[in-house]
Amino acid sequence: VIKLKKPLVSIVVLNWNGKEYIKKCLESIKKNTKRRLYETIVIDNGSKDGSVEMLKKMKGRGFLDKLILNRENLGFSNGNNQGFKEARGQFFFMLNNDTLVTKNWLDNLLKKAEKYPKAAAIGAKIIDKPMFDSKNYKILSDRERMTVCGGAMLMRRNAAEKIGMLDAEHFSPIYGEETDWCYRARNAGFKIMETDASIIIHFGSHDTTKQTGRKKQFILMNTNRLKAMLYNLTIPEFLGHVPGLGLVFWTALKQGEAGWLLKAYWNNFRSWREIFKERKKRNAGLF
């Protein structure tokens, strides 16, 4: 076995009051990943639930390589960007703290990275815990996407160096940042891929749903995802998303959340000057 001087992959895990989840997450990484391939970087965003003390102990036991401690919650983009700056790998892997990785997850992702050299990011298959059946799970295919989930996303360092890190200025504290990054990568000539060959088990949006409330989460998520589209997509690309946006509105209407969705739309409408300015800056163009 040839030991690499630098890890091939830097796994970046952001934590905020997720003590009950991140311990299992880190244990699954150590159990299911070849040690010579990776380093693990954990950023704690000002947790008050005992996470910090536990993470310090786990670092001493070899479950993580670097621990970054923030005094307050700096948000998803800022937190992950801190991890990227400390990372030594050729690839970054953003991983939610409320997840478990499975056998051969990283090996399979790296095979896909080799297969798709033009891919700036490759999203793993995220399956909710109650729905996962390892015996009957079938690998279907790889797909090119407009965007993939930042909760389990492999990113090439050279792509990140070309287009920049996550946009903390426009997408704080959370939501839309990985969508925006994927759009920027595509506009720079890269591809975004998703594969079923790497499986990540997800317990649910612990940090946001439990601690910020459903209404605030819903408005913020839809505000920022629409903002990412308006910042980066051409008119034909945006029109291609209109049916999906209509379905989102119909679902919100049935669930009594249409008012929240209209609030998200209004947040972007009243910021139209900033949106046009940002489109010009990003050279999004019209067609």
Tell me what each language-model feature is.
Residues T234-F287:
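Non-catalytic, C-terminal membrane-associated alpha-helical segments of glycosyltransferases
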